[in-house]
Amino acid sequence: MICMYRIEVEDLNVYFDEAHILKDINLKIPKNTVTALIGPSGCGKSTFIRTLNRMNDVISGFRHEGHVYLDGKDIYDPDMDVVELRKKVGMVFQKPNPFPKSIFENVAYGLRVHGYDDRDFIEERVEESLRAAALWDEVKDKLDKSALGLSGGQQQRLCIARTIAIEPEVILMDEPCSALDPISTTKIEDLIHKLKNDYTIIIVTHNMQQATRVSKYTAFFLHGEIVESGLTEQIFIEPRDKRTEDYITGRFG
């Protein structure tokens, strides 16, 4: 039986020392779709996506209860290879974070880390990734130049290219447009629409309009809980919970 869900979260609770951050989270993420996570600051959205590639593991006091399944396998099983997990579940952060290397080496870096050393393969994969990130035409003549010289929007697309170079199954995006201007934001949103054909994308956003533009599914977080989740259109047009309605109409948050 083929599962239609890329990620399934069951009864997830997350603690940092005595602080109970996420409470009884249940959520299914379908394959090759965009799911938006919305909610006020401090409600647990970023903590949640960091449970999906075990980035919280490095934070002192972290512990969890419950299950997070990727393609049917619990990522918190003791035999899980965390390096391999993070290859499958890539991450794009709020602020673009290119390495102080050339544009080419920024994209090639992950390939080298994962053991690829064939020059022709790396060159081909770098070009494919930059094209997929809608950046190739802007940088193809300056691949040896520092990535730090790119604009903010270009740097964020470079970070997306770096993420997809190692062919993940899932891309996590933690407010990827919050530091960008409107034109750069539009380019990232257009890119998300294109990437969903090949990847499962989960995006944290405070921008309600962005959530409606880019996602098929939405989950509303509040005080560490999911108030409701479902089709984005339903969440925004006919929310089932008054707290959801109050948030998306700007009554709080």
Curated annotation (Swiss-Prot):
Bilayer disposition of the protein: Peripheral membrane protein
Broad enzyme group: translocase
Binding sites annotated in the UniProt record for ATP: 39-46
PANTHER family: ABC TRANSPORTER I FAMILY MEMBER 17
One cellular component (GO) term of this entry: plasma membrane
Protein's name according to its UniProt entry: Phosphate import ATP-binding protein PstB
Enzyme Commission designation: 7.3.2.1
Gene3D superfamilies, sorted: P-loop containing nucleotide triphosphate hydrolases
Subunit architecture: The complex is composed of two ATP-binding proteins (PstB), two transmembrane proteins (PstC and PstA) and a solute-binding protein (PstS).
